[in-house]
Every structure is written in structure tokens, then in C-alpha cells.
Amino acid sequence: MKKATPELLEGYLKIMEAANKSNDGNRCMIAPSPELKKRLKDDLKKIKKQFGASVFSNILKPMGKTKVGLNDALLRPGNSFPLGMSASRVKSIAADRLPLQGTVRVIVVLVDFSDKQFSNTKKQYQDLFFSEGMLPTGSVKEYYKEVTNGLVDIAGEIVGPYRMPRTLAAYAHGESGTGDAAPNARTMAQDAAKAANSAVDFSLYDNDHDGYVDAFVVIHAGKGGEETGQGSDIWSHKWVLPGVYNADGTHVYAYLTVPEDCKLGVCAHELGHLLFGFPDLYDTDYTSEGIGDWCLMAGGSWNNGGLTPAHPCGWCKAQQNWVNTVTVSANKKGVAIPDVKDSKTIYRLWKDGGSGNEYFLAENRTKKNFDKFLPGEGLLIYHIDDAIDSNSNEMHYKVAVVQADGKKQLEGGANRGDAGDVWPGASKKLTFSNTTKPNSKSYGNIKTDVGIKKIKSTAGIITADLFVKAGPALAIVKSKLRKVKK
């Protein structure tokens, strides 16, 4: 067993410092691979035993109030917004622009370095991003076609590889490319834009005609820091250039970068930031698991080793109108809830059907298509608080999975999801209400009267009684409403 040496401590803290850059500025980084996460946990145990937990006091705690760009999809420089606009409003505008639908064009630039050359062909990336029926586990195009219910068609081109003016070691800068000091990964992305300018008409990639390229992707030679944990390898992320790069009557600013052996899940996750404004829904300070393997924007980007990423969660889909969100305004009996991939429907529940930042969402997820490698299948219930920026505080997530077994293993970091999270699931839980464990009370411990009862799964279809008021459910029989005892 590896000894907890000072060198191990230094290496661990460097990885955590690089990873925590997603809590600062405009960086949104991919979650570490399961293998790296396990290694970090093992190292953490050894270091705590040898040096004591106090060495982590400034590293592993939530970062508190952060700058604009934390886990959001800031796509334009701050000075492009009206003077005096609040940071939270800027974040909201960046993430809540009109959904991109129809053909969405993506430019992919390949780059290598004098100390690390490209070993793959351009066709491999053409297939990974834009092919149909070519890859056994699917392409970016096929992934977004499925999860958006056909509303988004990813298209574009691959150019390069271009030799960068600096080495990989220089851009990584010992900090996985995410350090503040130049050169870093954003310097690399700017150099990539300059190198590709003569071959690319960047105006074709401003899909919503707001004056900014929507998806500028840089694929670099070498491995990703999210898998190796090495400061000499660039950690996949979404960030912004050091300054706006003007080309072809438009602006290049936001970008994402992934390594040459990039997995579909990494690409789809980072495009979730860049194109659709999704925040990271894993815990970016790594003290918990966020919503784990249930969502592309959390650990689900790594399902099947990153080859078969999970669908975005129902909350993400609702932000982009990829699903029909049914607001439950009256108690209903015997509601049939098919797999969201078939029904394209999720359910919103709160006291009396009220609006506001806090509420519950429910969707049915089964193990098929890109959801094939989910940790379980059944009814997923989420506790949402849109007033919260991220999933960094395990006591109060922005988007939380209400785990049916009540063990809160996602918050505790015990796993990235299991069959006990869903309803009825492995724990065979049939009722969710004010009085069950887990319960439907608000974060302020106030009864909401939300209930999902008599939960049953038959051939992949969930049926349940839905409650948002104290009192009986209503059933529709021969076009007449009759009261039904709870």
C-alpha cells in the first residue's frame, strides 16, 4: 500500500486545487473519472490518517460566494451586459437564453504540440461528433437527437490538427491548464482560434445570431487530467478566452476543450454547458456526489466508462423545453407515468400547485438507449431549489435526488447512485409524503402536502396517486369526478 508521504499530500492537494478551479471565474470542468475519484478517496484516507483532517480545511470546504461563471454557461464577456446588472442576473441571462433548436452547428479544432503529437485521424472525430449508425455506442449527434426528442440536430466540421506555438507542458502549466497565470488552456484555445481562422468561417457557428460563436471545441493531443490526475495533462472544461477573438464578423469567446481520447460523455457534458447553459450537478468541491450517475451533468457523463452517458435529468430537460412539464394542481389518482424517453413528460409538484423556486419533479427512467447503464430504474423524485447556484452544498443542493431508501448516499459520497434511489426500486418504497422517510417537507421543514402514493411499476410504466393538497385524490370515471379515499 502506498504510504501517505508529504509528496502524496502535495500531489493530492494539487489535484484538488486544479479541480476546484470550477468554483472560480468562468470554468466548468468535467467530473473526475470514477477511477480517479476512487484514487483520490484512497489517498484522502491515507493522508487524513497520517497528517490529520485539518490539512484540508482550506481545500475541501465549499468555496462560499463565487464570481460570475461558477458552474453556469457564461458565453459573453461581462462588459456586454447592461451596467449595474447583478451577477446573479448575468448568470441567469447566460443560461436562460432562448433554447437552441433545429440544426445547431459546432466547430471542432484539432491541435497538437511539439512535445505531444496527434495520433488519431480526423475521421475518428467526424464519426464521434456527427455520424449516424457508425459507432456501436453512438455519437454526439445521436445522443442529442435522442435526449432532446429530435429537437436538436448537431452538425458542423472538423479542422486541423494545427501545431500550437507552445508545448503541452507550457499550456498545462503544472495546473492541468486551469491556473490563472498564462499560458494556460484558455491561451491554447485562443491560439487554436487564430490557427483555424483561415480555414473556418466562424459566422456559420453563431446559431442564434447574437454575435458570438455558440460552440467552439478544441480537441488537444494527449490525455485528460480528469482521468490521469496529473497537472501536466489538461483537465477537460468549458471556459472563455483571455479576450474576445474577432473573426468573420462574429466573436469567439466561450470554448470547451477535451483530449484526443475523449469519450462521448465528456463531449456531451461540456456541450451541455456551452450550448444549453446547464450547470454542473456533481459536487464541484468533491465532498459529495451531487445527483451522481442519474444525469449527464453529474457522474452520468461517465456511465459505461464514458461511452454511454446518461440522459440529462428532468430538471435540465425542462430548462430547454425538451419535455412537457405537467404542473400538478389537484390531487390525482392512478396517474400512468411511462418512461420519460417515451412520454416526453415530467411532473412538477408543490403545495396547492404553487409556483416558486422550490418544488419537486418526478420522472420515470428505465435502462434503455443512452440510459442503459443507469444504476437503477423506476420513478426518480428530485427536490429542486432554483434559488441555489450549484450542488456544492450537500445540505442544500440546487437539484437533489430524493433517494427512496433514505440513506442519502449521494450526499454522503458513498456512491454515485444505486437501485435504492428510485421508487419503488430496491427498497420497495411505495409512498412519498409529509410523514415518510425521506419526506416531502420543504428545506425549511414545512409541510408541503406533496405526496406520491401507491407507486407501482409494471412493464416499465409507473402508476401512482399524486397529491399537492391535504385531502382526497380525484379519479376520472366516465367523464365525472368522484372522490377517492386516500
Regions found by a protein language model. Give the residues of each.
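Short, polar loop/linker segments at the starts of domains and inter-domain junctions
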Residues: 119-132, 308-312, 392-402, 411-412
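Zn2+-dependent metallopeptidase catalytic core
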Residues: 2-271, 348-354, 441-443, 449, ...
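Short, surface-exposed, polar/charged, turn-prone segments marking secondary-structure boundaries
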Residues: 135-139, 324-325, 387-391
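A broad, low-specificity signal for short, low-complexity segments enriched in glycine/proline
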Residues: 177-180, 258-259, 318-325, 415, ...
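Viral virion structural and adsorption modules
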Residues: 479-486
